[in-house]
A protein has these predicted regions:
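Metal-dependent catalytic core segments for phosphate chemistry
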Residues: 251-277, 452-527, 552, 560-564, ...
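Walker A/P-loop
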Residues: 44-66
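A contiguous, basic/glycine-rich beta-loop/short-helix subdomain that forms a polymer-engagement track
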Residues: 185-218, 228-237, 366-506, 517, ...
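Conserved RecA-like P-loop NTPase helicase motor core
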Residues: 503-515, 566-675
Length: 718
């Protein structure tokens, strides 16, 4: 479809009307360019897909929503906007789309959250009830559906009142009641524990109400994990050919896809025996009480017993083999180099894939048959069997996916990482097997790039080291296929608004020097606090260990510090905002997750402290296998893995400072490698153009280290 004059006029009219809705709106050339590029892509006028980097201040959300809605209406398609996390998803749903509704009055939009974000009304009813008979009935369906105490029951009763009176839509993020994770895990549900259409609460269930709203919406706000799952199962969202898809925070997509395709399952022999025995009993119950129309051959007791016996013997053999690779009786991990399994293990995995597929098919057959019997049997007993069969199906599906992946030598042209772990819980040993592909470009090509006609991938940061090459390699997007890659200019004047400070540290932030380096960092940080130039500050660390060491050096400032983990992030940010707005000094302290999605303007954040260049950890099985593979191709892992990742992290960290034309301040980076190493200049060149200063650092004597040195020299003298 070409961009008609009428369509261009509609987009221009909405953009002009938007300017009247936003106080102090500043027209920005990069925003107009993004609107044009997005419109050309979604209308199919230019290229297949578009990857567009839109730095902070461009206004990327509205820049894709305006042309996206206009083209979706013209083509009678659904615009799906996907984000990396629930917080950003909720911001678009609760803030940006309601703003657009002021200029597009009949705009219909909804949000698609994962099942686990919604309350299950069946579980809520059980936990809110004070009637023993009601609790007994629901406890029969699920053993964990009785309240632990009176306070829990009262909270659940309040939530139920809010849900019943439509004051609450059932989404965890939309209630002002504090619900801890332990309680929420019992209030929500998962696919394996959901009765779906067979549930008494199906029509009013918040999850299914939200799913039905998707069919009527023009705009659906989802997240990457849900989109990947929906494309795999062809459920939830409209058909791919009827979609316009925008992937915001698109730099997360390869990792989300890899996480979605990672398979792990417990293979402890006694546990596995128990699961198989329970399944055999469940099949026997179905045959006796809910006889299916046609009897599957595998449901024959003797045949099913023999099938499960072979499966168990293979699992037991695999346990014995894996135990040879790990120290006896203790927690351990073994990774198979380059993902290459011994021939014997590979043959076991291939056979397990076939056997678990047959059990998966049997469980699915019984589940479908049971779902058709809800009007002719005791509902409570039937529902209990339905739940148990649904969980059995979930287990066999997971096992089957695991063994199929384990049977592959490669995925997307790269090895599949394979490893086993042994953990000890409550004195009991548990063995797990894990598989994940180190590249997911083929899967993304199949699920997204080839299925959806036109997709926009956007983020404030898509490049690393001024290049899209890492994104292209990890995602499978490529210019040869007609994909376009655009990097917009920042609308801010970084030279005038801020500067980078690299203190003259005596030590590099390496493990051997960590104590001395953090002591120096703490001394310079203290100096900055005492100068009282900045009300709002942020300190970012690459590891929790380093953050805790730093806190030991600034215990006298602890009341000023709002540390990640003390409270939920949104509460820390709320408290920080209140402090600064009342004229108090406040310091947020956190890890890399605080370098993303934190939008604090002006005095709320005028100084950012960065502990060191955040290279990715090198002890992950996936990273190690990728390194082995790259070396086998004569590629340098530091150049392909570590440096692009570090560049990306640094760009995000530095990007916390200048969020508007009125922002100002400094970014302090406590890592002299930016000036002393060859790669330092490349990392700096990828950052916004700030002037750089190199002040001195107060001299620090590290007492702890001095004591250790004295002890060591004492030993030598003796």
């Amino acid at each position: 479809m070409a961009l008609t004059a009428a369509l261009k006029a509609q987009i221009a009219a909405w953009y002009k009307a938007l300017q009247e809705q936003i106080p102090d709106f500043i027209p920005r050339p990069p925003q107009r360019q993004m609107i044009a590029d997005v419109a050309k892509t979604l209308a199919g006028e230019e290229g297949r897909h578009l990857a567009i980097e839109a730095p902070t201040g461009v206004g990327k959300t509205l820049s894709y929503l305006i042309p996206g809605i206009a083209i979706a209406r013209e083509e009678q398609k659904t615009l799906v906007v996907s984000t990396a996390n629930v917080a950003l998803q909720d911001q678009i749903y609760s803030k940006d789309l309601p703003l657009l509704r002021k200029i597009i009055p009949d705009l219909r939009f909804t949000a698609a959250f994962g099942r686990g974000r919604y309350v299950c009304p069946r579980n809520l009813t059980a936990l809110a009830s004070t009637e023993p008979s009601q609790q007994d009935l629901l406890a029969f369906l699920d053993d964990d559906l009785t309240p632990n105490n009176q306070a829990e029951q009262k909270l659940c009763a309040t939530l139920k009142q809010d849900l019943d009176s439509y004051r609450w839509d059932g989404l965890r993020d939309h209630t002002d009641k504090a619900i801890d994770d332990a309680l929420w895990s019992r209030l929500s549900t998962d696919k394996a524990s959901c009765l779906n259409r067979n549930c008494h609460y199906y029509r009013e269930c918040p999850f299914f109400v939200a799913r039905r709203e998707i069919q009527e919406a023009e705009v659906v706000v989802a997240n990457h994990a849900l989109v990947m799952a929906a494309m795999e199962s062809e459920a939830v969202l409209p058909e791919p050919k009827n979609l316009l898809l925008v992937l915001d925070e698109g730099h997360h997509l390869p990792d989300v896809a890899r996480d979605a395709l990672e398979m792990s399952a417990e293979i402890t022999a006694p546990w596995f025996r128990l699961q198989l025995d329970l399944f055999c009993k469940l099949v026997a119950t179905c045959m006796e009480q809910f006889r299916p129309k046609t009897t599957p051959p595998l449901a024959n007791p003797e045949r099913l017993t023999g099938h499960c016996e072979e499966l168990f013997e293979l699992i037991a053999s695999l346990n014995n083999i894996l135990n040879l690779y790990m120290p006896a009786g203790q927690e351990a991990e073994h990774r198979f180099p380059m993902g290459e399994l011994p021939q014997e293990v590979m043959e076991i995995c291939q056979r397990l894939a076939k056997l678990t597929e047959m059990l998966r098919g049997l469980a699915e057959l019984f589940l479908n048959d049971l779902s058709e019997k809800t009007g002719s049997h005791d509902v409570v007993r039937l529902h209990r069997v339905l739940l148990q069969m649904n969980r059995a199906l979930g287990m066999f599906e997971s096992q089957n996916k695991l063994w199929r992946l384990a049977s592959l030598a490669q995925s997307s042209g790269a090895p599949v990482t394979k490893w086993a772990t042994r953990v000890v819980r409550d004195g009991q040993i548990h063995v797990w097997f894990h598989c994940v592909g180190i590249r997911v470009s083929d899967q993304l090509e199949r699920l997204l790039w080839r299925s959806v006609p036109h997709i926009v991938v956007t983020s404030a940061t898509l490049r690393s080291l001024n290049s899209f090459s890492r994104l292209q390699e990890m995602s499978g997007l490529k210019e040869k296929a007609g994909d376009r890659f655009v990097a917009l200019d920042s609308p801010f004047n970084h030279v005038e608004q801020g500067k980078i400070i690299i203190p003259q540290m005596r030590y590099e932030p390496l493990m051997d020097n960590e104590e001395q380096h953090i002591a120096e960092m703490a001394a310079y940080f203290r100096q900055q606090v005492e100068s009282k130039k900045h009300l709002g500050m942020l300190v970012l660390f690459a590891s929790g260990r380093a953050m805790n060491r730093f806190l030991e050096h600034v215990t006298d400032l602890r009341l000023m510090l709002l540390v990640q983990g003390d409270q939920p992030r949104y509460r820390l940010v709320e408290l920080h905002r209140k402090r600064v707005e009342s004229g108090e000094r406040s310091v947020l302290v956190g890890l890399q997750s605080f370098a993303e999605g934190l939008d604090l303007k002006g005095d709320l954040l005028s100084q950012v402290h960065i502990h060191k260049i955040a290279f990715p950890p090198i002890d992950s099985p996936v990273v190690i296998t990728e390194g082995e593979w790259l070396k086998s191709l004569n590629r340098y892992p530091f150049e392909v893995q570590s440096l692009p990742s570090a560049s990306f992290n640094l760009i995000q960290q530095v990007g916390r400072l200048i969020r508007s034309h009125h922002c100002w301040g400094e970014v302090v980076i406590y890592d002299k490698r930016l000036l002393t190493k060859n790669y330092g200049a490349r990392l700096l060149n990828a950052l916004p153009v700030f002037p750089i200063e190199q002040p001195g650092v107060p001299e620090v004597i590290v007492k702890r280290k001095a004591k250790q040195t004295a002890k060591q020299s004492g030993r030598k003298r003796r």
